[in-house]
A protein has these predicted regions:
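Retroelement reverse transcriptase polymerase core
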Residues: 1-154
């Protein structure tokens, strides 16, 4: 993460602990325990899509493509003045995120809002966005390909 500009060395009084969580495939997922930080963080109440609205939008389509914006949160920079709050401790030292990490209480709302802005005119008409997953849908193959192109061009 250091070499990709996701984290940087830090000296921060906010440092949280790292937790390694075992995934279904046996590999480990790097997580930071932000419970203390989250307990004092302003909660962003931006709404996530409702399932019945999603099902209604998809109901007339026959073609579907799913896109997973893997590491999508890492495309949202953290303000320099807030980076120390994202700090964590490892055996190699203290680091802080330069981009939005998973685990922050407001991260899902921030990301959903961004995706809704980026795909605003396509949402519920050509695609559905739920956090870092996008479903592009269409009634016919040509329509589906056109809609995929529209999503990719954003």
């Amino acid at each position: 993460m250091l070499e990709y500009g996701i984290i940087e060395p830090a000296a921060s009084p906010w440092a949280s602990n790292v937790v390694l969580v075992k995934k279904k495939d046996g590999s480990l997922r790097f997580c930071v325990d932000y419970r203390r930080l989250n307990s004092i963080t302003y909660k962003d109440s931006y709404p996530l899509p409702l399932i019945h609205n999603c099902l209604n939008a998809l109901s007339d389509s026959s073609w579907y493509s799913t896109l997973d914006l893997r590491s999508g949160y890492y495309n949202i920079p953290i303000a320099e003045s807030d980076r120390d709050k994202s700090a964590f401790i490892t055996r190699q030292g203290c680091f802080r995120f330069m981009v939005m990490p998973f685990g922050l209480t407001c991260a899902p709302s921030v990301f959903q809002r961004l995706m809704d802005v980026v795909l605003c005119r396509l949402s519920y008409q050509a695609c559905l966005v739920y956090l870092d997953d996008i479903i592009v849908f269409g009634k016919a193959c040509n329509e589906q390909l056109t809609r995929l192109g529209e999503v990719f061009s954003r």
